[in-house]
Amino acid sequence: MSDNQSWNSSGSEEDPETESGPPVERCGVLSKWTNYIHGWQDRWVVLKNNTLSYYKSEDETEYGCRGSICLSKAVITPHDFDECRFDISVNDSVWYLRAQDPDHRQQWIDAIEQHKTESGYGSESSLRRHGSMVSLVSGASGYSATSTSSFKKGHSLREKLAEMETFRDILCRQVDTLQKFFDACADAVSKDEFQRDKVVEDDEDDFPTTRSDGDFLHNTNGNKEKVFPHVTPKGINGIDFKGEAITFKATTAGILATLSHCIELMVKREDSWQKRMDKETEKRRRVEEAYKNAMTELKKKSHFGGPDYEEGPNSLINEEEFFDAVEAALDRQDKIEEQSQSEKVRLHWSTSMPSGDAFSSVGTHRFVQKPYSRSSSMSSIDLVSASDGVHRFSSQVEEMVQNHMTYSLQDVGGDANWQLVVEEGEMKVYRREVEENGIVLDPLKATHAVKGVTGHEVCNYFWNVDVRNDWETTIENFHVVETLADNAIIIYQTHKRVWPASQRDVLYLSAIRKIPALNENDPETWIVCNFSVDHSSAPLNNRCVRAKINVAMICQTLVSPPEGNQEISRDNILCKITYVANVNPGGWAPASVLRAVAKREYPKFLKRFTSYVQEKTAGKPILF
């Protein structure tokens, strides 16, 4: 055959020097870098089956290895300066190893390189060694039959390809042998036919011989054997045709079985790759979808700073998104406030307490009258309507106070128009839903009972602007526009913006009053009344939406008589608080959002403020 030489280029005839056999297994002690704390530690290292494994010690091999790496794609790097060290890296995993001496290191490197080389696909010695698993013997006289059961399904495609190469060599030699046999047979047949034709021609020319009795004598069997002798073709005496045929059949069966297994392996790999491709395709689809959604959200957010995505008559943000954004902004403000309060507490305990009291020491339960001024706003004074300083809003203040004393103290628990929205201990918050021209004007009323403080103390802290920032967390800034009297001022304040809602500002008159009891059994009552007014010093501006308010903090002090002749202490006093708020927020915020914010923020304000008053008055003289 013309291709016989090329087909046999990787035949089974091998030079003994090149056939080194399988790589030698190796084991021994090497120092391995563990970490920067423990440094180099001796480990028992085993090199076997193209895998490098290490154990803590030789005695602990039965407990399993501490780690192992496959050497197929390993990179072995001798250290440039340390003659005993070499590194083995596979992807991101790196082993730092040290041998006893440079020769020991070189022995390990050579052994590892040998395992790595023998693990590679396509090496000549690897294919020859794999082909030797086929139990077919090449010889001139015949080949042993090979059962297809010897081709185990567990072999890899690489091994099966090596077997196919061995089968190819065997089959080529078998074909050559059979071709020689057929050529010899053909030559013998052609010579026999030529000789037969020649003998026949000679017989036709000869005369028959005569016997003694006169009869003719014809040549029969004897002459035939001489004329047509049994000729054995030259060159086929040493060939067992039947054996060659059986071996050829076994070889072709082996090729078909191995080829079938190769196809099966390729189909499995194709299925595996198809699954991986499907998985990667699905991942890509998800990533593209997530990217698309992220870009959509990013485009949204890029426009959220514009006027179309803020509170307004033509806002593009829907009610649900509006509520979520407001809630998220309030949560952030709460976290900032918690951090601020924690810092204040830390600074409070790290510094010494100032001497003196915020309140004037006036005894334990006797009320002393003294002039009221903003500089001593926390001092006690009996503020009654008759002693108020007259100013241009006096009649308006009087009307507001009388309305609150008449209507705000009424019990609304049984009124069907009022809804109980929050109840936490002594605190109850009611709301009555009112809308006017699409604007939420829900009146709100809260009742609370606080122990250890008086109504005068609560109202003073609520009215006094000097301590406003200590408990008020929703104000961005404020200032007193005008002082009308010692107990009445006009305040302009700007509230912190809660995106996407517009920022609000408020201009209001704040007045504090003491309402004298009609009889000695009635509780002492203090009131702070805040209601919106106009002032030339604080005109409307485009930056904020001006809100209108009518708020009252009404506090009544209840005293339980102490036992015996003991003086009244804070354990004997209770402040009953009624807080009412009528707010027109203005703007275009959704009604559901305003109601949800009010339900959330009003109880928080009341708890925070009353806790602040209790904290500030603890241990100080009682101010009735």
Swiss-Prot record:
Query: Where in the sequence is Phosphoserine found?
Result: 126, 132, 135, 315, 373, 377, 380
Subcellular location, in the record's words?
Answer: Cytoplasm; Golgi apparatus; Endoplasmic reticulum
Q: Which reaction does it catalyse?
A: N-hexadecanoylsphing-4-enine(in) = N-hexadecanoylsphing-4-enine(out)
Q: Which UniProt keywords apply?
A: Coiled coil, Cytoplasm, Endoplasmic reticulum, Golgi apparatus, Lipid transport, Phosphoprotein, Transport
Query: Do you know which PROSITE patterns this protein is assigned to?
Result: PH_DOMAIN, START
Q: Name one GO biological process term.
A: intermembrane lipid transfer
- Please give the coiled-coil regions recorded for this protein: 263-303
Gene Ontology CC terms: cytosol; endoplasmic reticulum; Golgi apparatus
Q: Where is this motif: FFAT?
A: 321-327
Q: Which InterPro entries match?
A: PH-like_dom_sf (IPR011993), PH_domain (IPR001849), STARD11_START (IPR041952), START-like_dom_sf (IPR023393), START_lipid-bd_dom (IPR002913), START_lipid_transfer (IPR051213)
The positions annotated for binding an N-acylsphing-4-enine are 472, 493, 530, 579
Q: Where is the START domain?
A: 389-618
Q: Which Pfam families match?
A: PH, START
The post-translation modification note in this UniProt entry reads: Phosphorylation on Ser-132 decreases the affinity toward phosphatidylinositol 4-phosphate at Golgi membranes and reduces ceramide transfer activity. Inactivated by hyperphosphorylation of serine residues by CSNK1G2/CK1 that triggers dissociation from the Golgi complex, thus down-regulating ER-to-Golgi transport of ceramide and sphingomyelin synthesis.
Bridged cysteine pairs (disulfide): none
Per its UniProt record, what SMART domains does this chain match? Answer: PH, START
What terms describe the molecular function in GO for this protein?
A: ceramide 1-phosphate binding; ceramide 1-phosphate transfer activity
Q: Where is the composition biased (Polar residues)?
A: 1-11
What this chain does, per the entry, is described as: Shelters ceramides and diacylglycerol lipids inside its START domain and mediates the intracellular trafficking of ceramides and diacylglycerol lipids in a non-vesicular manner.
Could you give the domain comment from the record?
The START domain recognizes ceramides and diacylglycerol lipids, interacts with membranes, and mediates the intermembrane transfer of ceramides and diacylglycerol lipids. The PH domain targets the Golgi apparatus.
What is annotated about its quaternary structure and interactions? Answer: Interacts with VAPA and VAPB. Interaction with VAPB is less efficient than with VAPA. Interacts (via FFAT motif) with MOSPD2 (via MSP domain).
Q: Which PANTHER family match?
A: CERAMIDE TRANSFER PROTEIN, PHOSPHATIDYLCHOLINE TRANSFER PROTEIN
Name of the featured protein: Ceramide transfer protein
Q: Which organism is it from?
A: Bos taurus (Bovine)
Lineage of the organism? Eukaryota, Metazoa, Chordata, Craniata, Vertebrata
